[in-house]
Amino acid sequence: MQKPQLLVPIIATSNGNLVHAAYFLLVGIPGLGPTIHFWLAFPLCFMYALATLGNLTIVLIIRVERRLHEPMYLFLAMLSTIDLVLSSITMPKMASLFLMGIQEIEFNICLAQMFLIHALSAVESAVLLAMAFDRFVAICHPLRHASVLTGCTVAKIGLSALTRGFVFFFPLPFILKWLSYCQTHTVTHSFCLHQDIMKLSCTDTRVNVVYGLFIILSVMGVDSLFIGFSYILILWAVLELSSRRAALKAFNTCISHLCAVLVFYVPLIGLSVVHRLGGPTSLLHVVMANTYLLLPPVVNPLVYGAKTKEICSRVLCMFSQGGK
């Protein structure tokens, strides 16, 4: 016996032609039953607590310690703030879905979540590029580092990254609102992403496809190319150093950033490739999306906390004082 499709209330626009759902239904991870989802909620809550504690700690340490008011740490504070917001946008809703089976998400809230996820991801990409530029100047032009990356310049870079991310992705919710949707409104995902909402439409989505591809190439694509080019120049400069110890010390300052870049871009590239292959949303697609959104907020504080001596020592000092 075929399982009946779950129908969702439809809202029509004033012209009576375009329709959209009152809410969408989130599936979570396709193929997994309620019991598995329930048990997955506990590691998810642990990840959220770890991401919140880790990123908040980094932001507060950099805010309090005036000696850390340098470009590298200011960019790190921006990265931690973005990760903190991104994890708060995705993880609590996922936890309610996994723990209590609350699948419903209102149409406009879904669009807002989608917009913030994509826009803040673009901002994070720009901050990672800025951090690569900081490492390039520090290693290749150390005498000019203080004059090139002043506090004012860092603030302008941060504001530009935020503006670019929000401006590029601002049209997406409106483009999705113009589409008509089918009678079934089940999103085979744990949260709302542009490509998954777009697949539910009964109308032509070529504008969405073209604009989405344009954003990926012009934002994340360009950023990743410049990051790669920066590291080619950094590697070239490091290899030209006469002392092996100096070369290792110089490159060691880049390891944390390289880890952050890999954790962000590898799942993003995988997600883009899987999506471009077309077809229904697969388990691999969902896993890649979850990795892309959930892993960086958890991993970045751990990597920077372990590899950055100033932050690590401050955290150890806080714990030692708290234990007295």
Curated annotation (Swiss-Prot):
Keywords: Cell membrane, Disulfide bond, G-protein coupled receptor, Membrane, Olfaction, Receptor, Sensory transduction, Transducer, Transmembrane, Transmembrane helix. It is a multi-pass membrane protein. Residues 60-67, 134-152, 231-250, 307-324 are cytoplasmic. Disulfide bonds join 110-202. Gene3D superfamilies: Rhodopsin 7-helix transmembrane proteins. It holds the Pfam family 7tm_4. One of its GO terms (molecular function) is G protein-coupled receptor activity. Its main location: membrane. The chain crosses the membrane at residues 39-59, 68-88, 113-133, 153-173, 210-230, 251-271, 286-306. It is found in: Cell membrane. Residues 1-38, 89-112, 174-209, 272-285 are extracellular. GO terms for cellular component: plasma membrane. Belongs to the G-protein coupled receptor 1 family. Odorant receptor. This is Olfactory receptor 51D1. It comes from Homo sapiens. The gene is OR51D1.
